[in-house]
Amino acid sequence: MAAVSLRQGDLVWGKLGRYPPWPGKIVNPPKDLKKPRGKKCLFVKFFGTEDHAWIKVEQLKPYHAHKEEMIKANKGKRFQQAVDAVEEFLKKAKAKEHAKEHNSSDEKGKKGEGKGKKQTGEKRRKSSESSSHSPQKRSRDQSPRKRGRPPKDDKDSPSPQPSSLKKLAMKTVSRFSWPPPSTEDDLGSDSWLIHGHRTLGTEMILKKPSVTYQAITKRLKISEEDSGSTSIQAADSTAINGNIIPTDKKIGFLGLGLMGSGIVSNLLKMGHTVTVWNRTAEKCDLFIQEGAHMGRTPAEVVSTCDITFACVADPKAAKDLVLGPSGVLQGIRPGKCYVDMSTVDPETVAELAQVIVSRGGRFLEAPVSGNQQLSNDGMLVILAAGDQGVYEDCSSCFLAMGKTSFFLGEVGNAARMMLILNMVQGSFMATIAEGMTLAQVTGQSQQTLLDILNQGQLASIFLDQKCQNILQGNFKPDFYLKYIQKDLRLAIALGDSVNHPTPMAAAANEVYKRAKALDQSDNDMSAVYRAYIH
C-alpha cells in the first residue's frame, strides 16, 4: 500500500493493538504529553468513545478511502455509534462551510452595491460643488451608520463562520487549543469527553466534561517513577467494550463476594469463557445460568483454566485459598497464570508469588479500587504488578471489568499503592462522618452542609453518596466497614515498616474500631458515623 500523507485535522481509521480499526481525528497532543520513542506516531482522538492515544502511522488509514471496507468488517453497536458520530461531525462542518459561502456572496453583493452608491454620490457631489459652494445636507444614502447596532436589513443574516473543514485541515500546533471547549456547539462538533485506550506510557483521564487544563495535562503525563513503574492506560468499559475481542484463554474466578460478582458478570457479558468457584456454592448458581462453568475446588479451576483470578476478603483468606486443602497451589502447572485481586499486605503477596512461581506458574497481583456499584458497572481501577506478560494476556479481561489499569512494576507495588489509596479513602470517610455529626450537635442542617460541600472543591460522587447514606440512615454495604478498617490497619503497618508516621490514619482506625464494637462491621463504611453518635 502506497504511503499516505496524514496531518493534523485529518479523519482516519486507527488500529490499536488487537482492537478493530476505529474512526478518529488526528489532533495536537497537550504540551506535557511526551511522544513515544521509536516509530513515527500521531495523536488521535477517537469518535464515539472520545478516547485519545498515540497511534503508529502504519496503523492509520484515511477515513473516506476505507469507510466502506471498515463498515463491512465491523458490525458492533459501539462501532456504529462511532461512525454515526463522524457523519454528524461532517454534516455540521458542511453546514458551516455552506453558511460561510452564503455569507461571503452576500458580503460581495453589499460591497458592490456600496461601491455603486459611492460612485453615484461622488458624481452628485461634484455636480453640486460646480453649481454652488454652499453647504448641503448629505443624502440618506450618504449618511454614516451608527457604530454598534447593525441596520435592520442585516438582522436576520447569519454571522460569517470559518469553515470547519478548512480549520481542521489547516489548524497548526500553535493554534490548536486546550482546554476542552465549554459551549454546547463545541462539545457537539469536537467533544472532549475523555476516556482512554490501553496505551503504554499514558494514564487514564476520567470522563469529566468540566475537567480543567491542569488536570488534563497532569493526568496525561507519562508516569515513570524511579522504581521503573509505568502506568498503562486501559479502555473505559463504557466506551468500546461492546467491541472487546475476548481472549481465547479459559478464565477461572475464585470468590464471588461484592466485588467478584460484578467482575464475573462483566467477563461473561463480554464473551469470556469463565469457570467459577466460591466457598458457598450457592453463589455460583446465578453465574452458571449466565453461561459460566462451575469448579468443585480451587485446584480444579486452576488446572482446567489458563488464567485464574481470585478476589477474597483479607490476607488470611488469600493464603488459605492458595495453600489450603485442594487449594490453588495443587492445580498450578508450568505456564498456568494466577492473578490475585485481593487487597492484602506486600508481605502476603510476595509469599503467594514465591510459591506460585516455584511450581512453574506465573503470578500477577491486581487489586482493584472501587466499590460494588463500580464493579457492577465495569468501572473499576485495576492496579497490577508482577509478570507483565500475564498483565498483557489479561487485557481483554481488564477491559471488561474496569475503566483503567496501571502496571506498577515488581510484585508488592500494587499492594502498597492499594493500601495507600484505601487509607486516604477511609480517613476521608471518617472526616465526613465527623463533620456531619458536628453539624448536628451544633444545630446546623446536615443537608445544608452537604449542599455546600457539593458546590465546593470537595464535591464528588463518593462524598455525595456517603452523606446520603448518613442522611437516610441507609448503610447497605457498598464497601464493608470491616474491610476498610482492615486496610487502614495494614496501611499503618506499612508506615511502621519504613518508619513513616501515619497519625491521621491511626486516628481514623480507632473510630472504625469503635464502629465495629457497635456491630457495624457488615454495614457500609459510612456506618462509621454511628461511632460518633453513640
Swiss-Prot record:
Keyword DNA-binding assigned: yes
Start-end of Basic and acidic residues biased regions: 93-122, 138-157
Chain intervals for the UniProt region annotation (Dehydrogenase domain): 242-534
DNA bind region: 144-156
List of residues binding NAD(+): 252-266, 343, 486
SMART domains to which the protein is assigned, alphabetical: PWWP
Subcellular locations according to the entry: Nucleus; Chromosome
Predominant subcellular localization, coarse grouping: nucleus
InterPro entries: 6-PGluconate_DH-like_C_sf, 6PGD_dom2, 6PGDH_NADP-bd, GLYR1_PWWP, HIBADH-like_NADP-bd, HIBADH-related_NP60_sf, NAD(P)-bd_dom_sf, PWWP_dom
Family indicated by similarity: Belongs to the HIBADH-related family. NP60 subfamily.
Protein name: Cytokine-like nuclear factor N-PAC
Annotated organism of origin: Xenopus tropicalis (Western clawed frog)
